[in-house]
């Protein structure tokens, strides 16, 4: 039997829009701690608080995003959120006070929270159900390519250009992404009956256990994407920190090429479990790097890159599986809510990781302690998924 068609113009446009959105995001992500330190003289704890405002704002808007997307036309909401996300990069260039920067960061988080839920939901509308896992994998691959180039280019530009130039490049990327988003055509959506507002219109209750497991897993991920460059500088690793993101993105990209197909074959819980085992190992090794640097700096530098690649494989394996897991627990008229719950769970953990990572490093004297605590949380998440979230999914999945 011939496979359902995966590639379409709208699928290509939304991939491009997603890449440009995340390129704009990742371009400034690793330089923001340095920007706050240089421009506003913020300490590690304050940096963690400010950066977490973005994630907390995205978290707050996620449940409402899911409800709005399940109730109203999705494309206009997607374009509105994308335009706001794009414009705020210009605001960073004129923010002369820390308080103004914080307000802009919160607004940016709201826009990011809405546009990512909308993009994921529209993607699911476009994809044939028989190739959903594969399509989600390629969609995530666009994120990974952005992650491969964005942080590396951002860190390079930090040493050669002003911060305003970097923000301008993010603004340009966002503008091009908005054009791509405008080209996306969505299938006709049947009007739905306006049901009374209840908890399950904002949060997929059946996804609670999987959400807890994903939340625990995302805490150390948030610590890594934000603080790994500072950690490398702290312990004296000579490798360009931008390479960490490049190799991590390579791992994410390679793993997505096969994990989505395994998900479409029904091996969702197996794929997630294997990814969790590898993720736990990478965080323990990341925590051990500080001590290993005293033993053999050259070996530790190579290990640093190896950890990045392995971490990418671990999370790239899990992302399409977790996304599909939430969608498969929900009826078709709650796709937005399912996507919102998936991303909300992720954002809660990222926000905790941003705040906790800086605070742990400040109080205990190094980011290695933050990554050690993150490794322990990954082990806890693995046990929780194996004995609670996974069995619950197998009992309650709708497809």
Q: Where in the sequence are the language-model features?
A:
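Helix-loop boundary and gating motifs at the non-cytosolic
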Residues: 9-48, 218-231, 235-237
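Paired small-residue
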Residues: 99-107, 302-310
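Structural signature of the two symmetry-related core transmembrane helices
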Residues: 76-90, 171, 270-285
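Helix-breaking motifs and short loop linkers at transmembrane-helix boundaries and internal kinks
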Residues: 41, 73, 94-99, 267, ...
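C-terminal membrane-cytosol helix-exit motif in multi-pass small-molecule transporters
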Residues: 171-190, 384-388
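Residue-level signature of mid-helix packing/kink "hotspots" within the transmembrane helices
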Residues: 55-63, 147-148, 249-253, 257, ...
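Cytoplasmic helix-loop-helix junction between adjacent transmembrane helices
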Residues: 106-142
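Conserved MFS/SLC helix-loop-helix module at the cytosolic interface between two early adjacent transmembrane helices
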Residues: 60-96
């Amino acid at each position: 039997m011939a496979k359902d068609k995966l590639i379409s113009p709208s699928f290509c446009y939304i991939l491009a829009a997603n890449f440009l959105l995340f390129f704009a995001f990742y371009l400034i992500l690793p330089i923001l701690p340095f920007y706050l330190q240089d421009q506003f003289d913020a300490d590690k704890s304050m940096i963690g608080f400010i950066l977490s405002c973005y994630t907390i704002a995205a978290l707050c808007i996620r449940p409402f995003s899911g409800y709005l997307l399940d109730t109203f036309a999705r494309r206009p909401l997607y374009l509105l959120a994308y335009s706001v996300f794009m414009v705020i990069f210009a605001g960073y260039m004129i923010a002369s006070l820390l308080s103004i920067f914080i307000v802009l960061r919160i607004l940016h988080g709201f826009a990011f929270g809405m546009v990512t839920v909308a993009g994921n939901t529209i993607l699911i509308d476009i994809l044939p159900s028989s190739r959903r896992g594969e399509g989600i994998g390629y969609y995530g691959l666009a994120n990974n390519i952005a992650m491969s180039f964005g942080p590396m280019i951002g860190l390079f530009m930090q040493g050669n250009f002003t911060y305003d130039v970097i923000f301008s490049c993010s603004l340009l990327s966002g503008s091009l992404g908005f054009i791509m988003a405008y080209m996306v055509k969505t299938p006709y959506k049947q009007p739905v009956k306006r049901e009374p507002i209840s908890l399950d219109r904002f949060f997929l209750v059946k996804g609670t256990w999987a959400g807890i497991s994903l939340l625990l897993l995302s805490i150390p991920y948030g610590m890594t994407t934000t603080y790994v460059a500072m950690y490398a500088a702290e312990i004296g690793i000579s490798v360009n920190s931008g390479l960490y993101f490049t190799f991590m993105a390579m791992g994410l990209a390679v793993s997505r090429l096969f994990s989505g197909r395994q998900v479409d074959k029904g091996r969702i819980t197996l794929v997630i479990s294997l990814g969790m085992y590898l993720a736990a190992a990478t965080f323990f090794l990341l925590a051990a790097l500080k001590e290993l640097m005293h033993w053999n700096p050259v070996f530790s530098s190579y290990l640093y890159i190896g950890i990045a690649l392995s971490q990418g494989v671990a999370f790239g394996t899990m992302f399409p599986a977790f996304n599909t897991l939430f969608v498969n627990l929900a009826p078709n008229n709650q796709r937005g809510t399912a996507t919102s719950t998936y991303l909300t769970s992720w954002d809660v953990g990222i926000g905790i990781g941003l705040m906790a990572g800086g605070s742990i490093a400040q109080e205990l004297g190094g980011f290695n302690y933050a990554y050690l605590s993150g490794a322990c949380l990954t082990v806890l998440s693995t046990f929780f998924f194996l004995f609670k979230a996974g069995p619950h999914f197998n009992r309650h999945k709708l497809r």
